């Protein structure tokens, strides 16, 4: 989606996922139609579950949601937060 945005908007729009601009949604729908015409599976990388659900409603056969680095960062942050919640009391100072 980021490369498609840059290509179609000639740099006018910043790259990113889950585009809401009518021209980008129309482009995604044209891609689905072209894939259907040529018996090709259409896939789209999405940033959120909501957008992925919309993409399947538009006819995409496969969607991905998020990416490895985001999932790992979120899991690491949740793990550290959980540890801190269990080990730090109100009167405890940091280790450094």
Briefly describe each language-model feature range.
Residues 1-96:
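Expand to "…catalyze enediolate/carbanion chemistry for C-C bond making/breaking, isomerization
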């Amino acid at each position: 989606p980021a490369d498609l945005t840059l290509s179609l908007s000639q740099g006018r729009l910043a790259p990113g996922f889950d585009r809401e601009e009518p021209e980008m949604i129309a482009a995604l729908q044209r891609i689905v139609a072209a894939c259907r015409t040529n018996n090709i599976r259409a896939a789209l990388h999405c940033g959120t579950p909501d957008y992925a659900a919309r993409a399947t409603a538009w006819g995409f056969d496969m969607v991905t949601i998020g990416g490895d680095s985001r999932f790992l960062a979120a899991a690491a942050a949740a793990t550290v937060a959980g540890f801190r919640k269990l080990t730090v009391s109100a009167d405890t100072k940091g280790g450094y």
